[in-house]
């Protein structure tokens, strides 16, 4: 992640798009067609609540066998916003195996929000699992989203 970078998704192929159901607990999304790639971008298009915040407690990418791929060597390549004023809400919290920690965007940065994960190697991606914050009214829960998966990094 570099200060001042801005992700450019114009012209990129959308791998999947949809909407999450409001509520707590894991949500699993399966792609109609598997996609090979090393860079996984989740673009949050709108919130469940009427605010600017996006938050993710934990996140898995599903591999060829339909099971989560190893997160051991993952890195956050890009996050458009991270809340660090009121807490340590950096994007790497989405794969720290702690459901009580989470990534959260700054409240004055409007949607859409983007997060790019470097999976460290090319994987056959068949879907993903998303865990919103486990609190009353699931603050920061994403509603509509798009996913992009590529073997090479995105443009910034």
Residues covered by each model-derived region:
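Aromatic, loop-rich ligand-recognition surfaces of beta-strand-rich domains
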Residues: 1-9, 22-73, 83-156
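Solvent-exposed serine/threonine-rich low-complexity stretches and specific carbohydrate-binding patches
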Residues: 10-20
């Amino acid at each position: 992640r570099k200060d001042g970078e801005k992700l450019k998704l114009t012209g990129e192929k959308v791998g999947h798009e949809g909407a999450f159901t409001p509520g707590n607990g894991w949500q699993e999304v399966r792609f109609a067609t598997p996609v090979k790639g090393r860079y996984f971008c989740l673009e949050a298009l709108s919130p469940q609540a009427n605010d600017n915040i996006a938050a993710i407690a934990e996140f898995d990418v599903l591999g060829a066998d339909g099971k989560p791929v190893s997160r051991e060597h993952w890195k956050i390549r890009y996050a458009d916003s991270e809340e660090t004023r009121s807490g340590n809400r950096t994007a790497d919290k989405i794969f720290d195996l702690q459901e009580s920690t989470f990534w959260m965007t700054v409240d004055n940065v409007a949607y859409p929000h983007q997060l790019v994960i470097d999976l460290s190697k090319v994987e056959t991606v068949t879907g993903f699992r998303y865990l919103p914050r486990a609190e009353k009214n699931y603050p920061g829960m994403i509603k509509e989203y798009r996913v992009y998966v590529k073997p090479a990094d995105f443009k910034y």
